[in-house]
Amino acid sequence: MTSARLTTPIARDRSRLLRIGSRRPAGAKAILPRLTGAGGQSLCSTSHRRRPQSWNGALNLDGWSRIFDSAVHLWSLTIHWSLPLLALFLIPTRLSAWTNGELSIWFDPDRGHALEPIIQKFENDTGIKVKLESPENRTDDFAMAVQVGKGPDIVIWAHDKVGEWADAGIIAPIEVSPELRDRLLPKAWEAVLHRGSIWGYPIALETVSLIYNKTLLEGPPPTQLSELVDLNAKIKKKHPEATAILWDYNSSYYSWGILASAGAYVFGKKEKDYDPQDVGVATSGAIAGLSEIISLIRAGVLPKSVTYSTVEEQMARSKIAMMISGPWAWPNLIKSGIDFGLAPVPGVDGHPGRPFVGVSVAYLNRSSPNQDLAREFLEHCVLTEEGLTAMDHGKPLGIPALISLEEKMVKNDPLLQELKLCVDGGEVMPNIPQTSRFFTSLGAALQIATNGQASPEAALKEAAANMRHL
């Protein structure tokens, strides 16, 4: 029976936490500094404690003042130095010290069981046990754990954390051999490049596409937003309760492919690194894209408000012919019996849509003493046709980063053939920490422009200014 298993967060063991909190490595300095008062005297020492000269069963005002000042100073220092220790005590036991002879991985809960045969072989070959866990707050727990020298050896997450975690010093860079570099798709390596180093192992790529209902849509999917008004009328004529298209148009993520189609960009680059001061969300192409979206709202093709859950629900009920979404939406459509296909996101001004490409990545914990072992497991067990096929069976990966497997899977799966075209036409989402500025600023701009509070140009220029100055 393999030791690989999915575990839920372990209940906190109070006695164990107390032992962890009191343990200090041999030769290490005390965690708390010596608390001192004026003149360098220790406030915890008894040598300086003497009564004021006016002590006659009471203290004079000056004596009370000095004692009060000392107490406040002691209190502030205690709070300052005890909060990090308190955080350490509150860390769940799954974030505690490393286990000898064991490799720990934080993983997607839907994929862990599928890897058991691969893990069993690794355990038999090496004698090293592999433990899979799926914390609910994987990214937050990982960042907190690494800061105190703990956590898993490997964590699987999207590439949007590359810059943040690399700059914070919580993930380790990897040395990529020419052989390994040639095995994986170039666009996958682009996602993990930051400040001249590679910060993780790419696993798979995915993007949004135009998902269309083959029953409702007769003929080829539209390539331009400008086609949708006439197409909507045509669909309604045959299917009165249906409309042509719906997506979460106020989402920076789902609408970006339209705005980027005519040349908008998030950040420019200086050599190979992103320049967060070179912002391209208010270009003429971006303005044209947002103007087209607003035209569809005014024409009644799109509703005046929308949520993503509504989009999925309407598509599953055949109330819309098309939506913009990703592979995560496929299972619900399959379950609902929808016969669907994929096409590139439509664009503006004759250009195809250019959506974001996301890459799932295996990161190495910089604090881990097992980095060599983790690299061995990832390079020779996971990034193989057998390993990635097992992961895909647990939950669809999208386009595997491994070229040999990508070619085989795409050849045999029509949906993956269509998704591959969308990935090839997309752009890798920026991986620097400042990308969060983009999502919040552009999201606000889309909201105020689509509800008529600002023109597309004014809204996007404000978003660009906010991205530069935050």
Task: Enumerate the language-model features and the residues they cover.
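Short helix-initiation/N-cap motifs at beta->coil->alpha
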Residues: 134-142, 160, 226, 303-316
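Short, solvent-exposed loop/beta-turn-alpha elements that line the ligand-binding surface or hinge
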Residues: 176-184, 265-288, 335, 347-355, ...
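Glycine-centered hinge/linker elements that transmit conformational signals in sensory
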Residues: 232, 275-305
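Hinge/lid segment of periplasmic solute-binding proteins
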Residues: 159-208, 220, 225-231, 342-343, ...
